[in-house]
């Protein structure tokens, strides 16, 4: 294919994609609706606006997001250059001055000779040319209607995220494997049994826990079929026990009896290193989630690799729709990038923009698509987003539970360092080819 690549959306992913495409000698038309029109959450006229926190999270390679940052730095990321140039003191985290950050990105985009910035709302998808859709979690209604034409029923408007825990942080003396009534393979779920006393204490804690207040543009949301656990508890003390915590069809091998209540954990990935709390979508604050959910037997020392949330979020079912290159299956000219792909987080969005950018440029240049090695942070995230079980797909941030295991025995305290070391070595080899 020839000509310019059109990018819809001037957020982190769209700007990163534009930078990578232009850096490979391909023209870009970047279309951003601000300041002609603002979403309910945006206020700055500049590009790459950080809507929520000004933190890009941890810097250490002990955190997978810290590793992803380092990978993007090595890959020549515009977003990471902007973050490093506009950082503010934040301990072990990378936080930025959000206005300076936006200005930095805007100036670089506007100053690049191969990038044309068009500030107007997109309501129709271009019929020709390579396209990167990076319209973000607050995609306008008009554009969302057009996206339905290419995504069908696989376009969602709200997420309902349950917490995810690392399997190796669970207490195996308390948790048992079983499926309700022995269905499936008979041991598909991990089960945390609660006595009546433990259940009552848990309900009390849920009812008393602090909740995240809804933002103005989220207050009309009705979560059909995925009510927050705290709202279920408010309906009555037994509601949870007849809902997600129902014990029927399960026998605690320690007692030989049906527990009073059971919290079920379902595998989040094929390797079985991550498990989500089934039915535990919630709007409790993150500190309260850690405190309250660690009251569940077996989860006392649980490592939460993702905490629960429920908010406005336009995203597609990536396992159904996307190739590992972030190209749309069945439509070789269209790519997706950013939170609309189901990645969660600023850095993850930039990473997806990087990959969609280099692959759309490679398409224009007649080159084969590139997929990062699965042992890298970017590769592990891409592999999860595009191969996770489609039926239960929800947005995901990068975490070490997504990575392929190391070969041989490695002490737990050394594991993350070794994963990071392996990732960066493989990344350097891969970058030399793209």
Curated annotation (Swiss-Prot):
Record-level GO cellular component terms: cytosol
Keywords, comma-separated and alphabetical: Cytoplasm, FAD, Flavoprotein, Methyltransferase, NAD, NADP, Transferase, tRNA processing
EC number assigned by the record: 2.1.1.74
PROSITE patterns attached to this UniProt entry: GIDA_2
Molecular function, one GO term: flavin adenine dinucleotide binding
KW Magnesium (keyword) present: no
Positions of FAD binding: 9-14
Enzyme class: transferase
Subcellular location: Cytoplasm
Cofactor: FAD
InterPro entries noted in UniProt: FAD/NAD-bd_sf (IPR036188), MnmG-rel (IPR002218), MnmG-rel_CS (IPR020595), MnmG_N (IPR040131), TrmFO (IPR004417)
Entry keyword Endoplasmic reticulum: no
Superkingdom, natural source: Bacteria
Main location: cytoplasm
Function: Catalyzes the folate-dependent formation of 5-methyl-uridine at position 54 (M-5-U54) in all tRNAs.
Family, per entry: Belongs to the MnmG family. TrmFO subfamily.
NCBIfam families linked to this entry: gid_trmFO, PRK05335.1
Protein name, per record: Methylenetetrahydrofolate--tRNA-(uracil-5-)-methyltransferase TrmFO
């Amino acid at each position: 294919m020839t000509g310019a690549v059109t990018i819809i959306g001037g957020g982190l992913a769209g700007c990163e994609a534009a930078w990578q495409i232009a850096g490979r000698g391909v023209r870009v038309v970047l279309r951003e609706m601000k300041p002609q029109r603002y979403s309910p959450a945006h206020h700055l006229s500049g590009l790459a606006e950080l809507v929520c926190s000004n933190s890009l999270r941890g810097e250490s390679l002990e955190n997978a997001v810290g590793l992803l940052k380092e990978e993007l730095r090595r890959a020549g990321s515009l977003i990471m250059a902007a973050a490093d140039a506009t950082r503010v003191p934040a301990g072990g985290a990378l936080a930025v001055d959000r206005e300076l950050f936006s200005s930095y990105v805007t100036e670089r985009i506007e100053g690049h000779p191969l990038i044309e910035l068009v500030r107007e709302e997109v309501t129709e998808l271009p019929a020709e040319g390579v396209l990167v859709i990076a319209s973000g979690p607050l995609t306008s209604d008009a554009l969302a209607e057009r996206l339905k034409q290419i995504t069908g029923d696989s376009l969602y408007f709200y997420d309902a995220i349950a917490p995810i825990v690392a399997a190796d942080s669970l207490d195996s003396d308390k948790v048992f494997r079983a499926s309700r009534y022995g269905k499936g393979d008979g041991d598909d779920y991990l089960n945390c049994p609660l006595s009546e006393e433990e259940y009552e204490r848990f309900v009390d804690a849920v009812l008393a826990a602090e909740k995240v207040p809804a933002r103005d543009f989220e207050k009309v949301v009705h979560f059909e079929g995925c009510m927050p656990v705290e709202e279920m508890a408010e309906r009555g003390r037994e509601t949870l026990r007849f809902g997600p915590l129902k014990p029927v069809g399960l026998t605690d091998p320690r007692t030989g009896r049906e527990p009073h209540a059971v919290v079920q954990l379902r595998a989040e990935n094929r390797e079985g290193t991550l498990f989500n709390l089934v039915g535990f979508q919630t709007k409790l604050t993150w500190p309260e989630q850690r405190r309250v959910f660690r009251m569940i037997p077996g989860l006392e020392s649980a490592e939460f690799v993702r905490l629960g949330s429920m908010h406005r979020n336009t995203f597609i079912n990536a396992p159904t729709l996307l190739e590992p290159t972030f190209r749309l299956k069945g439509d070789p000219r269209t790519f997706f990038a950013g939170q609309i792909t189901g990645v969660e987080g600023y850095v993850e969005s930039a990473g997806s923009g990087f990959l969609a950018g280099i692959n759309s440029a490679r398409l224009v240049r007649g080159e084969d698509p590139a997929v990062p090695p699965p042992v890298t942070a970017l590769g592990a995230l891409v592999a999860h987003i595009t191969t996770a079980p489609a039926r239960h797909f929800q947005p995901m941030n990068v975490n070490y539970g997504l990575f392929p295991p190391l070969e041989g025995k490695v002490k737990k305290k050394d594991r993350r360092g070794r994963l990071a070391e392996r990732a960066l070595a493989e990344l350097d080899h891969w970058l030399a080819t793209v």
